[in-house]
Amino acid sequence: MIEIFLAERCPFCVKVRVFMEQKGIPYVLKPVVLGGATSVVKEELIRLGGKAQVPYLVDPERSVRMYESDDIIAYIEEHYVR
């Protein structure tokens, strides 16, 4: 299942979250708190992507990882929206 790292007040994250919910695409939410103390989820984000930037998508079924809300939405649109 797709995992998406999102921060609560990030407008780009809201854009991805709203898109996923409108399209009914299931995903695992990985909540990230930016600017605060390092958390296990934030450490995982940095380990996987190399930086603490959100939104960040991980699709283990296709071995795809990416940043950038527009790229994430285009990817989901191409591979998961029916």
Predicted ranges, named:
Residues 1-8, 14-82:
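GST-like domain detector, emphasizing the conserved glutathione-binding G-site
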